[in-house]
Amino acid sequence: MQLANLLVKGYFPEELLPPFTTEDLPSVLPKVLPDLDELDPISGNKKRIITKSIAYSIPKIKGYRRNLGIPHPLHYIRLANTIVENWGDILTHCSQSFVTMSPITTKATSARSILKPSFKNTVRKKIIRSTGYRYLLKVDIAKFYSSIYTHSIPWALHTKDVAKQHRKRNTHFGNALDEDSRKLQDGQTVGLPIGPDTSRIISEIILVAIDKEMKSRLGYVQGVRVVDDYHLYFKTHGDLEKGRAVIHKALKDYELELNQNKELLLELPEVIENEWFSEIREFKFRNRWNYQRTDIITFFDTVITYAKKFPDELVLTYAMSKLRFTVFNVKNWKILQSLMLNALLIEPKILPYVAQNLIGYYKKGFNINESAIKDALEQFIIYHSDLSNDFEISRALWILKSLKIEISE
């Protein structure tokens, strides 16, 4: 892992607008790194500096919100540098999980410093690993990133007994990660900023330790874990109940709790693909403009129906992402544009895909309906301004700016 990668590709949450980048940040490293201990004292009598992360609100499904965190550059550099200096030991620790599908893997061509979990690979592993098992336990951790106890970082890396005996920064690098994580969160011991890849790395450190603890207590762990989302397989109901108790205890040891609203006990085989996913994935748009127009209307009717039937699923988000792969006839652009703008009222999360389509067809020279876009997005902005919804406001303004549409005063 290179420090520049964590700064350029892993600092800002991916949900931020394209104009916000950290591409120039590595240029300050020659000046900052030699004086890092002066700028951010970690020893001696100098006063310690702490900073707060900036909150950026994004939508979740069913109207819920999530606050992403953008740390102060100095303390992000400090934490990222500590991670890079100990990258080999971190990789060794994180390689010990046999269930994770969200390893801290890097790739030079990736848009992020840490690769996202592969959905296709996860589905394949679920099928293979569930073979011969009768029961499935689905669990995830309640408010995971915001409830991580930073003192548990050295526990995960060095064991709790060792960490409590040696608490100073320079004795174990887990203590340094603990201290650096607190500095960018106003000195708090609970919570990591959601969005930066440093939080992904630290969360995986803790979760791998939990995976190891479960295996130690059960003798085996069969299943998959995607970040904090577990699918665990058992042969008997007794084994399932034992596994359930063990994971509760393992999480409690790290000051974490299960999300009881999402805990499910199911008999296998499991339905791998929801009906909406399969139907939308296989949907094809015909080339002739009149047939294609019918297909567009059918597609949106189908998607809206499924979105209302499965309000807890990302139906609209997946559907809008699929539109990227079709070149629509210019005669159908007006109706497609209207249907996309209407869909925003149901699910604001689709804004990036709506933006991609609107801006993409605008650059291709399509005759977009500026007045309709202006009216729809201005009303959208007014509505979300009253709610202080950062994501919706900034994305809608970005679309208008990219399309060179002036907003009303």
Please identify what each model-predicted range represents.
Residues 103-118, 158, 248, 253-256, ...:
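Short flexible/disordered coil segments
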Residues 67, 71, 222-224, 257:
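Short, surface-exposed helix-loop/turn micro-motifs enriched in polar/charged residues
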Residues 237-298, 302-305:
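Polymerase palm active-site segment centered on the conserved acidic dipeptide of motif C
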Residues 11, 219-220, 256:
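Short aromatic/hydrophobic-glycine micro-motifs
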Residues 79-90, 157, 210-214, 218, ...:
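Hydrophobic, Leu/Ile/Phe/Ala-enriched alpha-helical segments that form helix-helix packing faces
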Residues 124-227, 233-241, 290-409:
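Conserved polymerase palm-domain catalytic core
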Residues 1-172, 176-196:
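Conserved two-metal-ion catalytic palm core of "right-hand" nucleic acid polymerases
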